[in-house]
Each structure stands twice: as structure tokens, then as C-alpha cells.
Amino acid sequence: MSLATLDATQHPNLPASAATLFKAKAQKKLSFEQIAQHIGRNEVATAALFYGQAKASPEDIQKLSELLNISPQVLEEQLSGFPDRGRSVEMPPKEPLIYRLYEIVQNYGYAYKAVLNEKFGDGIMSAISFSTKVEKETDADGNNWAVITLRGKW
């Protein structure tokens, strides 16, 4: 199994907690799916904690401490503040997969907006009251497809 790791030189804007969490994740050889199951979040929400893009609850801190063998005091110090969202990626992104996600919004953003406005009226989809997940589908020809679900309160 391939595991996501962190090259801190590629991500200079991440908080100190990112290096702490990714180092322990690599040492324990745990996937985000395994960590998510332990703390009771989905994989993407768990990864967002690692990248400093989500706020950790006291329960998250305790469970991460137990699973990753990191002092709860260290995690409390590093994770108890408010996340500084959106600063970890330069714009436009250079990493190819992240650029493709950016490109989706560039190409389909106004189409999404038009359809959402027709279905819901004037407003916006929340990125705070929000959940997302990633699933893998394999078609009849054996091709793998990524399915990304975005669910936000209107």
C-alpha cells in the first residue's frame, strides 16, 4: 500500500503540526483511511487535519495522540488554534492533481453556479457546513474512476 507522506520543502506554508503528524503517520505506516476509522472522521476530513486546514476537536487530539504515539500536550499546543485555511497552496497550483481540481472550477465553475442557482435560488454553498469524500469506481473495461463528492449547506 502506498502512503501519503509530506515533503515539507514543497509545503513551506503548513503549520508545525503537519510535520509532526505526517512523521508519526509514516512511522506507524498508517493510511488516512485507517486513521479516519480510529478518530471517527472521513478520510478527507482527517487529511485536512494533517494539512492544518481543519480544526481538531479535543476528542481528535486524544485519539490521534493514542494512535500515533504523540504527546497529547504537543498535539494540544499544535492543533488547538484556529486553522489558517487556504494558504497552503500557491495559486495557480503547480502540483498536477491539485491543478486539475483548480481547472475543474475554472472550466465548470459558472456552470455549477448556474445549475445550483436554478435548483436552490440565490445563495452560496457553504465550505464550513461541508463534507466531502473520495471513492474509487472501476468500470466494465477495468478503468479506474475517481468520484469526488462535495456536500455543502445552502
From Swiss-Prot:
Q: Which GO terms describe its molecular function?
A: cyanate hydratase activity; DNA binding
> Keywords on this record?
Lyase
InterPro entries in the record: Cro/C1-type_HTH (IPR001387), Cyanase (IPR008076), Cyanate_lyase_C (IPR003712), Cyanate_lyase_C_sf (IPR036581), Lambda_DNA-bd_dom_sf (IPR010982)
The reactions it catalyses are:
cyanate + hydrogencarbonate + 3 H(+) = NH4(+) + 2 CO2
What does the record give as the active site? R100, E103, S126
What's one Pfam family the UniProt record gives for this protein?
A: Cyanate_lyase
Q: SMART domains recorded for this chain?
A: Cyanate_lyase (SM01116)
Q: Which family does it belong to?
A: Belongs to the cyanase family.
> What is the protein's name according to its record?
Cyanate hydratase
Q: Source species, please?
A: Aspergillus fumigatus (strain CBS 144.89 / FGSC A1163 / CEA10) (Neosartorya fumigata)
Chain's gene name: cyn1
